[in-house]
Amino acid sequence: MPVFKLLLSLFFILPLGVSAQGWMSSERSADGVANTFRIMSYNVENFFDVYDDSLHLDDDFLPEGSYKWTSQRFVAKAARLARTVLDAGGLGPVDVIGLCEVEGDSAPHHLFHRTRLARLGYRYVVTGGDDVRGMNVAIAWQPMSFSLISHTSFSVPLPAASQRPTRRILLCSGRIASGDTLDVLMLHFPSRRGGKSADPLRQAAVKTVVRVCDSLQHCRRRPHIIVMGDCNATPTDRQLLPLRSAGLRYVPAVIPAGSPVGGTYFFRNGWSCIDQMWTCGEFRGMECQVFVRDYMLERNADGLPVPFRTYRGPSYHGGYSDHLPLVARFFLDF
């Protein structure tokens, strides 16, 4: 208890976030050419558009739905997400961005073409809709630093016919400045809300990632693979052990010095890092940080810092997301 009181007192002295995060600004060589590559993973919390999709259960997130998801709220959220992405880039744009919980094509289209991000020229792809609510993952990239070669998505086989389909896993492969091919997998594993009944589906999702990574390792002479997204499990969870067995290495998410947060997600009075990055192959100087700014946080009823989310239950709260993003960088001379 004394330790807790000390930490709580420090929280009220220090600002919620941190003003600088070192290497997150793009590092450049003497001739001005970027010599680092930066990648971001962000669960953006129910980034629905405002249009009815007759093929998916998105009725709650319509203007007349239970969440009263209006055009004004959609535009405001897109602007907030754009602010986060821009701030994560610092002096230059993040090279590759992975997003969880985006609906269809119109939501990411607005984000990358109708906000302050439009001037940066991002291109993106988004998965199809296996998820019953139409929630997808997306990957966006800077064409100058990531030249797309191909993209594809993978459905997760259902362990039982009675289970609902889950989100697809997205793979984008591109050429980077070093001349190497970088393979980026974006995932959003099934929720933990189903308890043990959802375990088989989560295991099937992990096996799908392992299968894709195995194939990439066999077809690449020098594989450089990044797997990222919302794993809905901590890095040491037994369900993620197959990732390690497949040769993937977890990249620990560092909390910025002076920050009051303890991970990417706050649940039941505790922080955890369910948003993760894993790598296969050589990535020189690979580092990963939780990206946080004051405006992305608020205090809960106990006075603790938590993500400033868009909704609290069914009530509109007007924040950014219930997750904090990860930003990682590595040097381009492998």
Residue ranges and their predicted role:
Residues 18-115, 125, 129-135, 207, ...:
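N-terminal, active-site-proximal structural segment of metallo-dependent hydrolase catalytic domains
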Residues 104-106, 132-134, 192-194, 232-238, ...:
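Active-site environment of divalent metal-dependent phosphoester hydrolases
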Residues 1-23:
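Bacterial Sec-dependent N-terminal signal peptides
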Residues 20-31, 211-225, 232-334:
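Metal-dependent phosphoester-hydrolase catalytic domains
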Residues 102-181, 189:
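Structured beta-strand-rich core segments of catalytic domains in phosphoester-bond hydrolases
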Residues 45, 102-103, 188-190, 231-234, ...:
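Catalytic metal-binding/acid-base residues of hydrolase active sites
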Residues 38-46, 150-152, 181-191:
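Active-site-proximal beta-strand elements of phosphoester/diester hydrolases
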